[in-house]
Amino acid sequence: MGLVQAVVGSVGGVLADQWKDFYTVPSGLPATAALFAAVPQGTNAGRGSNTKGSSNIISNGSKIVVPEGYGLLLFQDGKITGFAAEPGGYEWRSDDLNSKSIFSGDGLVDSLIKQSWERFKFGGQPGSQQAAFFVSLKELPDNRFGTQSEIYWDDGFLNTQVGAMTRGSYTLKIVDPILFVKNFVPATYLQTGQVFDFTDMDNAAASQLFNEVVGSLAPAFSLYTNDPSKGNRISKLQQDSLGFAK
């Protein structure tokens, strides 16, 4: 029975994956979303038959539309294989057998026969993983912070230790998307349906960044109030927020 199911699964999956895909940005994203998977648009106004393709396979000839303000990261079996920072439409091409499609001129043998046999070896499913992710190149606003208790620093003007509670917001911008993904983003966010959002309280990586921002406030206040060029006055902070941030 398992053998028959594997045959049906491999053939059915191969046929479903022959269609070219059309990938775009998912709807309903928050402004602070930094990284998320491109989603295939199976139907448009009720028209379209490409609704049963494999979730981890991108067929050759598929089109990926990159909007303004975003970059495109391509993955093959967990490895970054490409990056595009310019907006526009891009065509997916891969030498992987699972991406072969008769609609992109890959031939009948590779697209159907060989691909079905390879999938049969994996119980009917493709033995490969491909993905396209969008990374925001815009400024990511409204990242809020605050302290639950007072933080202390040595004040040069008052010549004593001063404490204060703080709250505010800061803006982030990803300047190296590849380094951001390789060194910061947890693997759980490199999956379809996941959104890496810096304001998500359940995002451990974003929470760590928040903790580092709060942890840097005390030494920053100390440096500011003990800098003779600033007049040693914490009261000047509101007029010099950019100078304090530096």
Predicted regions and their residues:
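N-terminal hydrophobic membrane-entry segments
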Residues: 1-246
